[in-house]
Amino acid sequence: MKTCRSLYFILFITLLSACEFRMAPTEYWSKLFRTQTDSIYYQGKAESLTNHIAKDIEEYEINKITVMDFVDEVNRVSILGEYLSSRIVESFTDRTLFQDRMFHVTQKGEVNEVLQQLNLKHNYLYAKNDLENLGKSLNSQAILTGKITDLGTNIDMHLTLTDVTTGEVISSATQHLTRTKFAIEMLRQY
């Protein structure tokens, strides 16, 4: 009986020594509890919107657009609006989006300077004559505006691409963002 116990003990120790014991959380748990709104998350959302709008840009043969900073429900530019518009600019300037031709996006500094000269503010909707003046001053064929709306359960980012000469909406797209404390904080700071 003692021999049998000793044999089981040795077998148990042998099996236990061959097992790996890990104190760190597995990748499954880190993915499950990972923050959903890191920069890669926003980059993916911006690329999705950009790809949708790029299809219509190809159809209209537009070579240059202006991306305005995105506004909230009361037409103010929040930190989140600035950040997301920068991500959209980044996605549009990716050379893989328009491989067969040159495509340009107006620089933000130039946009802000022209808005100041024309006595305009970042807005979601512009009057037709304001669109024409912006297009002429920025040498742009279309203006991309965006609105960020807090719906309580999530945040909607809606983009509209408008032709500066006709005032016609060329394309529009919406993306739902995860509503986190961080996103709400960025949406409420100007």
Write out the residue ranges for each language-model feature.
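Bacterial N-terminal signal peptides that target proteins for export
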Residues: 1-8
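C-terminal/domain-edge helix-coil "capping" segments
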Residues: 19-63, 125-138, 149-190
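Short, solvent-exposed, polar/charged sequence segments at loop or secondary-structure edges
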Residues: 83-89, 101-143, 151-152
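Short beta-strand segments enriched in small/hydrophobic residues
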Residues: 63-74
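Bacterial N-terminal signal peptides
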Residues: 8-17
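Hydrophobic beta-sheet segments that form the core/acyl-binding groove
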Residues: 146
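N-terminal, charged amphipathic alpha-helical interaction modules
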Residues: 73, 77-81
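Sec-exported extracytoplasmic/periplasmic mature domains
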Residues: 54-58, 89-98
